[in-house]
Amino acid sequence: MSDIMSNFSWLYGKPVATGKLKQLPEHFIVKEILGFEFTGSGEHLMVKIRKTGENTKYVANELAKFCGVKSKNVSWAGLKDRHAVTEQWLSVQVANSDELSFAKFEATHPGVEILEVTRHNKKLRPGDLQGNQFQVIATEVTDIEDVLARLEKVKLTGVPNYFGSQRFGHEGNNVNEARRWGRDNVRTRDNSKRSFYLSAARSWIFNHIVSQRITEGYFSQPVDGDILLDRNDRIVNENVTSEESIQKIQNGELSITAALAGDNQLPTTGTALTLEQPHLDAEPDLMALIRGNRMRHERRAIELHPENLTWSAEGDTLTLNFSLTSGSFATVIVRELLQEIEVERTYSSND
């Protein structure tokens, strides 16, 4: 199988080490961080689940059946990996839940545990997700000393804030389908599918821009015309190439950004514009899809700094612990450490 992420540059060079991820679901543990408290009352039943080897949408649909509501009445803050152990909240719009016995649900769904149940006055939405805590275990790791040296660099400098391979689908099929939609001017009322391909299109272009900045030596170095964001994701209007700005970038107070393409003109100028515009021009079909859906231009930081990063190595097994803000991908951290050896998996029909 081809690696779609091989299209993009590595910050620390292509790793020499190899290793396996997710040999077992418990080798990839994700715990959701919402960042707010529930009211304890309201029309929405909040159910905290721990799922193993199941995807979020399947569990949500099963929970809807169990609660006697339609699937559209169950929502979440974020979709979680299937081949993993993940903890997250689901909200169910149901008036009376007194007669529900979640022990029965668990008995018929061995891959799901119900950890906590409460109520809230609003349903969960994707914007509610603050971040995720991760524990990632890589096995059969070669050249462990090189991996440990790279981890020190990651802790100091971070990694490219790429969108991970899951955004692009198996062998890039989501990107290819997005191109077809743009080329054929496909129209649909399926908002979920439209959002899916739009995200793939914008992510693909963003990754290429970041990759070029790495290749040309502008990853941590601002250029004239760059757009900077502060820690609250607000655009900062100042001399981006000044010593003060460079120092703030190095301190993590400001972030260099790249384009999430839209139908409006890029706000970058000068050298920054020459780094970005060619990647939009190189993908006319993706841009046709983006413009046809009136997506507005946005900015995304090009650096990703994992929080509370720790690690340990025992033999050829590496354990990583860290937290990421919403929208960031754990796999792009591992990508800078080792080349992943594909693990053969057999899935049930619940996907």
Curated annotation (Swiss-Prot):
The keyword Ribosomal protein does not apply. One of its GO terms (cellular component) is cytosol. One of its GO terms (biological process) is tRNA pseudouridine synthesis. Residues 158-304 form the TRUD domain. Keywords: Isomerase, tRNA processing. It is an enzyme of class 5 (isomerase). InterPro entries: PsdUridine_synth_cat_dom_sf, PsdUridine_synth_TruD, PsdUridine_synth_TruD_CS, PsdUridine_synth_TruD_insert, TruD_catalytic, TruD_insert_sf, TruD_pseudoU_synthase. Pfam families: TruD (PF01142). One of its GO terms (molecular function) is tRNA pseudouridine(13) synthase activity. It catalyses: uridine(13) in tRNA = pseudouridine(13) in tRNA. The active site is at D81. Its EC number is 5.4.99.27. Responsible for synthesis of pseudouridine from uracil-13 in transfer RNAs. Belongs to the pseudouridine synthase TruD family. This is tRNA pseudouridine synthase D.
